[in-house]
Amino acid sequence: MFAGATAGTDNFDTLSKGLSKEGAWIAAISKDLDASDKTLNVEGDFKNKEGEEARKLALYTQDADRKVTERYTLTVKKLEVNSPQFYISNGTVKGDVEVNAEGFHGQTGKGVDGEAMIDGNLIFKNQELLDAYNKLPSEEQVKVTGETTVK
């Protein structure tokens, strides 16, 4: 397991490795990261510390009490989600997000104004994935500035 991006990185290649099949269940950035000409692929099946299937992209830092202290923006050409139960936590992905695996959602932490956000389009592989996403509670849906569609 690769742990380089779990504590937060400011390097696209490290983040990419953290979200690869050989990565970790969680990957994080430690400041705004601009990779607007690149596609970030999320691959593999992972479990969190509770043993539940999950994959997390943390776009924030927090204090010792787990209160979010700063949120960040990850700018990419495209974020391609191929890991089940992947979620964006407390920050913004600027670029299109393409969902090819079940369970995609967002997370808002305690003490955060706003929510996980996509400044771009949210594109699902098929209608079944979009329908499942639309059934989520509003606090698990990501705010999207563009269109939410099926490709």
Residue ranges of each PLM-predicted region?
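Short, charged/polar "capping" segments at the starts of alpha-helices
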Residues: A35-D37, E128-N134
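Detector for repetitive beta-architecture
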Residues: A24-I26, K56, R71-N90, K94-D96, ...
